[in-house]
Amino acid sequence: MSNLKYAIVTGYSSGIGKAIVSTLELNNFQVLTLTTRLNDTVALEKEVKSLLKEYDIDLLVNCAGLGIFTPHEEISISKIKELIDINLTAPIILTNLMLRSLKKTKGHIINISSIEATKHSKFSALYSATKSGLRDFGLCLFEELRKSGVGVTTINPDLTKTNFFDDLQFEPSTKEDTYLVPQTIAYTVIDILNTKGVITDITIRPQKFEIKRK
């Protein structure tokens, strides 16, 4: 199709990212996959630059993320670096690499942050720092890019039923009104892209709050 658009979505293999990819593909997008580890910045830059020689990017969705909720002194230095690299550094670098292409297409950047970027919770200092950093990056970047026609949106989902919780000490309750599902976030992405004007920041929450300890 002549009006096919091109998107790059990180974290595409599971959870919210996988739902976003499936939904984009039903809405006239071809999703280009990155195979490089996001914390390997040298290889990542090489792969992105290779893709940009073939495609003009219409949409970048920074969705990949890791979580840890534990007393800060118990977190290893390597885990601190890994969370910062995946949750914050990689989206900033990918945006930097793709911005000229996005300006050309007057495209859109969507950052999947977290409800934790909007509040302060115990045992969440590291995770919240990375996600609030991503949120502020997006909000500032929108102001920078307004004249270019590039939209920037941050989505802050609350508890979403995905494998994100596999290695954590808690998970969403089994009650359906206490968690979101990935498809809700994916539909929100489409709504954002179809909105006249720019939704710069949106928080999505279930009606009730309840978690289950493992």
What are these regions (language model features)?
Residues 13, 21:
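N-terminal Rossmann NAD(P)H-binding glycine-rich loop of SDR-like oxidoreductase domains
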Residues 63-69:
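Conserved NAD(P)H cofactor-binding loop of Rossmann-fold oxidoreductase domains
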Residues 71-72, 79-84:
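Substrate-binding pocket helix/loop in short-chain dehydrogenase/reductase
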Residues 95, 130:
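Active-site helix of classical SDR
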Residues 100, 139, 143-147:
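Alpha-helical segment proximal to the catalytic Tyr-Lys
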Residues 114:
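Residue(s) in the substrate-gating loop at a strand-loop-helix junction
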Residues 154-155, 172-213:
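C-terminal helical subdomain
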